[in-house]
A protein has these predicted regions:
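Small-residue-enriched transmembrane helix starts and helix-helix packing motifs
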Residues: 1-17, 36, 92-114, 135-139, ...
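Membrane-interface helix termini and inter-helical loops of multi-pass transporters
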Residues: 55-66, 119-127, 162, 187-195
């Protein structure tokens, strides 16, 4: 039973290193500067996503080819990069949307959506099929996400206090553009457009 917890924890923690959700954690920490609601949102989103991974993962992948998923990912990264560059009032003070949704709900939704089709979701599906203790697998994959993302949230909160938000926004937009380029390359490769 312990193996059903420890192996998924290690696999997901390693898979998360350098993943887009770490960048998302950094952006949310810099934007909201409230690490604990963000961490709580990551926990809730990961539990919900990974609990549904076994059932939903196979269903969604049956509707889209790998190539289509790469194109969707490239478009979402490009849109996120552009959105990141646009200053909003939340940078200076909370708007009604920020008060209405806040860091917890924003993180919950963003992380849940970012994990759909992600390698950690796929890993969760495979691990749940391999190990008999589903609850331990879900707890393990959630712990792996926390091991990888909590330090980023805390560092992002610290960096936001020391660095101008404009610089953080530009760096994040650049990173999302790079991710979009990689996703376009993957889409072209899986479509057979390049060798």
């Amino acid at each position: 039973m312990l193996e059903s917890l420890l192996v998924p924890t290690a696999i997901v923690a390693l898979a998360e290193i350098g993943d887009k959700t770490q960048l998302l954690a950094l952006i949310l920490a810099a934007r909201f500067r409230k690490p604990w609601p963000i961490i709580a949102g990551i926990i809730a989103a990961t539990l919900a996503n990974h609990a549904a991974a076994g059932a939903v993962g196979a269903w969604v992948s049956s509707f889209f080819t790998e190539s289509v998923l790469h194109w969707i990912l490239a478009a979402s990264f490009t849109a996120t990069a552009l959105w990141t560059l646009v200053p909003d009032k939340m940078d200076d003070n909370e708007t009604s949307n920020a008060r209405r949704f806040g860091p917890f709900v924003t993180t919950l939704i963003a992380f849940f959506l970012a994990e759909i089709g992600d390698k950690t979701q796929v890993a969760t599906v495979m691990l749940a099929a391999q190990y008999p203790h589903l609850i331990m697998v879900i707890i393990g994959t959630t712990l792996g996400m926390l091991i990888a993302n909590v330090p980023v949230v805390l560092a992002g909160n610290f960096a936001a206090e020391k660095l101008p938000l404009t610089l953080i926004r530009r760096l994040a937009a650049t990173a999302f553009i790079v991710l979009a380029i990689v996703a376009v390359y993957s889409a072209m490769k899986t479509s057979g457009w390049i060798g």
